[in-house]
């Protein structure tokens, strides 16, 4: 026996009045969204209760009907949250499933709930409420990760490590400075979600199908009841707008990119070739054949999963790019992308917060790597400019020549003798060696935003104050 719903049943009594026959079973499968939009149940019920209260306040519903609707919707909410609600695919979506159950519970008044409302504005408000909640969750998750990076920055404000360009040693920096770079990225991520939330905080409920309604509704009342700043100002835009979802996905994609970048660094840094960090057993796995292995699987999986967030953004941009005003059924494809991106991002933020909180920096390996690869060559060039008044380009050439000599000898710059240096430029003095140490190098980078330990401590204190964590 087929599990497909019977097209001749009363499955589509919500809209089937002008149809002589029900939809094909395959059409029902294509059309149904209850498999994923049931996640909107709380927002749908919240919106419906606000709508019913407004209708009663405006004299469109009796207070008795509005009370029955409100209590019935709370019963539906309890049933769904208890896990026993019978979602029915033939009812297509969360809106019809809730309304059908409400009718079973309270009878005729349930049919009055949809007065002055369409599924077009209903889903628009449900989805906005859900995405708004996810913005709040993302902001909270980002702040937790910022605090984890700040703790690492404070602990390692003066731990020297190599800074890289092209994944090659460039100049010495501090561990704390590197950690604060991610705090800056995450702060921008946070601000993007804050901005997106502010822009989406307008209520589309009451726009109806696309043209508004002739009923004397109070859209400001429903907007206030649902925590929106104001109602949307154009009914056509209200039901066709998915900018709020696109902005959420855009902010999520950029944040995911930042998580992926640090995940990549963790994979590299935890390798035997680098040994910069030790990852906790909680975030690593072993090998089924190689007993010695400790694989950074959490970082690798996070690096891969973050690509799904970018993919979700591209997918929804692609759905929306060719749609005329106002609503098209294409827009039903908006939710799965947003749901998956939100789930993936929140998982990534939680995992990264745990990894950053648990990771242990190997100070010896960091310092040894910082001192290799001619990392203080720029300090030497700066000394030549500052002490010998050489033009920087000349100083750059002199330093490059000295690097080549050291490389030929198989040593680093501090291992060259003063006499060898003076063969390249006779003005070089003994005090040049003071600038060739990595500790002196990082201490000298005192320009605003530089890597000097005092700068790192000041920036960490600033961020703690901004996050409300200052002592």
Curated annotation (Swiss-Prot):
It comes from the Bacteria. It catalyses: 2-(N(omega)-L-arginino)succinate = fumarate + L-arginine. Pfam families: ASL_C2 (PF14698), Lyase_1 (PF00206). Pathway: Amino-acid biosynthesis; L-arginine biosynthesis; L-arginine from L-ornithine and carbamoyl phosphate: step 3/3. One of its GO terms (molecular function) is argininosuccinate lyase activity. It is found in: Cytoplasm. This is Argininosuccinate lyase. It is an enzyme of class 4 (lyase). It comes from Cereibacter sphaeroides (strain ATCC 17023 / DSM 158 / JCM 6121 / CCUG 31486 / LMG 2827 / NBRC 12203 / NCIMB 8253 / ATH 2.4.1.) (Rhodobacter sphaeroides). The gene is argH. HAMAP family: Arg_succ_lyase. Keywords: Amino-acid biosynthesis, Arginine biosynthesis, Cytoplasm, Lyase. Its EC number is 4.3.2.1. Transmembrane segments: none annotated. Belongs to the lyase 1 family. Argininosuccinate lyase subfamily. GO terms for biological process: arginine biosynthetic process via ornithine; L-arginine biosynthetic process. Signal peptide: none annotated.
